[in-house]
Structure formats: C-alpha cells, structure tokens
Amino acid sequence: MHLLKGGVVLIITLILFLITSSIVAIREDPSLIGVDRQIPTGPDPLHNPPQPSPKHHHWIGVEENNIDRSWNYVDYESHHAHSPIHNSPEPAPLYRHLIGV
C-alpha cells in the first residue's frame, strides 16, 4: 500500500515538473510549439498615433464652428446662459396656424 502511494506521488510530481518546465521553455522560445512571432520595429502605433495634417485639422475646426445647434442645446461652459424652456424658438411660419399664433 505504501509503495502504491509513493508511486502515485512520484507520477504526479513528474507530471507537474514536465508541465512547469515546458511552460518555461515555451515562454522563452514560442517557436518550440510552432508560433513564429514577429516583433514590429519602428514607432508603436498604439502609443504614438500619427498626427493629422494641419490642413485636415483646419477643416475640422471650420466644420465645428458652423454646426447648427438644436433648440435644446446646452452650453456646458455656462450653465445658465441658455434655457430651452424660456428661450424656445418661434414656430415656422408654415405651422403658425396650427397653434394659433
């Protein structure tokens, strides 16, 4: 009985040793299991994204300045400058007869 328990412990120990040593070897050289990893050279695109051209940046700025705001737009820099309840827009002339203006 003691011999059987010793054999089981020995087999489990050998299996754990083989697994851990193979994991260490694969981490050092992934090509052992057929993984050919190529490390890119040059600037890292995740941490150093290319900057937009000045022409493109200017076009975006012009587009942002010409945005038509909706009647319920809130300017978050000045909280009380625009109140959609008190400053509601006038109805279009086409629909004035529907509301009695």
Swiss-Prot record:
Glycosylation sites: P43
A single GO cellular-component term on record: apoplast
Region (Disordered): 37-58
UniProt entry keywords in alphabetical sequence: Developmental protein, Differentiation, Glycoprotein, Hydroxylation, Secreted, Signal, Sulfation
Keyword Secreted tagged: yes
Single annotated GO MF: receptor serine/threonine kinase binding
One GO term of the biological process aspect: cell-cell signaling involved in cell fate commitment
Compositional bias annotation for Pro residues: 42-53
Hydroxyproline carried by residues: P40, P43, P84
Signal peptide span: 1-25
Top-level taxon: Eukaryota
Sulfotyrosine carried by residues: Y76
Family stated for the protein in its record: Belongs to the CLV3/ESR signal peptide family.
Record-given protein name: CLAVATA3/ESR (CLE)-related protein 18
Natural source organism: Arabidopsis thaliana (Mouse-ear cress)
